Amino acid sequence: MKIKADAKLSYPRDVVFASYRDKLVELVPHLPNIKAIEVKNREDNEGVTRMLNIWHAKGDIPKVAQSIIKPEMVCWEDHAKWNQDDWTCEWKVVPKFFTKNVTCSGKNHFVEQGDETVLQIRGELEIDAKGIPGVPRLLAGRIAPVIEKFIVGLLTPNLLTVSDGLVKYLDSNKG
């Protein structure tokens, strides 16, 4: 399943890029579906920054998935490679549940548009429900779309609310 979202931010690209990369933890109060973000690792090297962040989400688990997904499992690793030379961020999301069954990755482009920035988020999510503990083989085909929709339902709005949160953060730190 494709993930595609665009956000226009009323700040210059260099400010948006650096703030998105460096101030993510400070955005949590502005992110309604996120409980916390933990920076686990950061490596800076000649215009490229590699990061590992752990995101902890808020969200209701669908009834059909409650026997499989526990509330403490609704978090994910965010592996990111920020490249300032081409204003991109390659990312890979690894959920704490169904790690071997879920593949999610993509690339964000920070596009300059005058004094503003357009953040283009592009990615792909794939789920294989076969082999997930607790999922009967005969139901795997029916449950996979529910789980996929749940994960995309958590990720996509958060991708856009991060941009909204970033604008609120930048607005509150002007001057």
Which residues make up each language-model segment?
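Helix-adjacent hinge/juxtasegments
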Residues: 62-85
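Residue-level preference for beta-strand/loop junctions
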Residues: 1, 72-74, 102
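Beta-strand/loop substructures that line and gate deep hydrophobic ligand-binding cavities in soluble
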Residues: 51-52, 76, 81, 90-149
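Soluble, non-transmembrane catalytic domains of enzymes that act on hydrophobic metabolites at membranes
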Residues: 2, 40-43, 96, 103, ...
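Hydrophobic ligand-binding cavity/cleft-lining segments
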Residues: 1-64, 70
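A conserved amphipathic terminal alpha-helix motif
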Residues: 84, 137-175
